[in-house]
Design a protein with these regions (language model features):
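TPR/TPR-like (Sel1-like) alpha-helical repeat modules
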Residues: 161-179
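Boundary/linker segments of alpha-helical solenoid repeat arrays
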Residues: 140-149, 174-189, 213-220
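N-terminal cysteine/histidine-rich coordination modules
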Residues: 1-75
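Extended interfacial segments that mediate partner engagement and assembly in macromolecular machines
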Residues: 63-143
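Short, well-structured alpha-helical interface segments that form or flank functional binding sites
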Residues: 48-51, 111-112, 147-148
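Alpha-helical linker/edge segments of TPR/alpha-solenoid repeat scaffolds
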Residues: 123-125, 156-167, 187-226, 232-236
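Short, intrinsically disordered terminal segments enriched in charged and Pro/Gly residues
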Residues: 77-96, 179-182, 211-227, 236
Length: 236
């Protein structure tokens, strides 16, 4: 019998089975990639980011908060068919992406598909990595915010979709960008021009400042889309 005040065991929001608590990754110590995949030690914990219910097969970072709409997705034939159609290492992310699409969260589904692409990177599966990046870019559509627009350009470039990446970069160049975002965009355009599909760190596009900025500069940096990423991670 559970004593009063004792923590309750987490349960799957779809079927009610006991499930593990959400994974808590360590803070990154290395700069992120241009698509914002975090650096180490967070990077290597990717396989732990999504939990899968042993009873019903639902997948999510936190199984306890799955919405009611997830039940219909998890019980659908298309969801069950994922197991035989895709490599095991990517299934948690693909399942989570399908649940998010089924509940109308396209932006969340794009993130899940990008994570599937990261898992393919780690498995040296370049075909699926490109395929799932292209799907992430499609799900994002035309992002309203600059950060996602920059990430989408990187995703398209790494998928080998150079024409689409060029068009997206041209559109973003017409918007008002802070200094860091403009530097990242220029770096991306140079990589696209050379048909580079490789991984690059943000620190390669925008080296961190060599000295501690004046307080006014630090205040401006709070509004800087990507500059905040250099406060903690050290360069690789």
């Amino acid at each position: 019998m559970t004593s009063p005040g004792a923590p309750t065991e987490p349960h799957c929001g779809v079927c009610g089975a006991a499930c593990p608590p959400p994974f808590r990754a360590p803070a990154p110590e290395i700069a992120p990639d241009l698509d914002l995949r975090p650096g180490e030690p967070t990077r290597s914990t990717l396989p732990d980011w999504i939990a899968t219910c042993r009873r019903c097969g639902a997948a999510a970072p936190d199984l306890t908060v799955l919405p009611p709409e997830a039940l219909a997705v998890v019980e659908a034939d298309a969801y069950r068919a994922l197991s035989g159609a895709h490599p095991e290492f990517a299934l948690p992310f693909l399942r989570w992406a399908m649940i998010l699409r089924g509940t109308g969260d396209r932006a969340g589904a794009a993130e899940a598909m990008l994570q599937a692409a990261w898992s393919a990177d780690d498995a040296a599966d370049s075909i699926n990595a490109a395929r799932w990046r292209a799907e992430a870019a499609f799900l994002w559509g035309e992002p309203a915010d600059v950060e996602t627009a920059l990430r989408r350009i990187d995703v398209l470039r790494r998928a080998g979709e150079f024409d689409a990446a060029t068009a997206a970069a041209d559109r973003l160049a017409g918007r008002a960008l802070d200094q860091t975002s403009a530097s990242v965009l220029a770096f991306q355009r140079a990589r696209i021009a050379t048909r580079d599909i490789g991984r690059h760190l943000i620190s390669s596009a925008v080296p961190p400042p060599a000295h501690r900025p004046h307080v006014a500069a630090r205040q401006r940096d709070r509004r800087d889309v990507l500059g905040r990423l250099f406060r903690n991670p050290r360069r690789e």
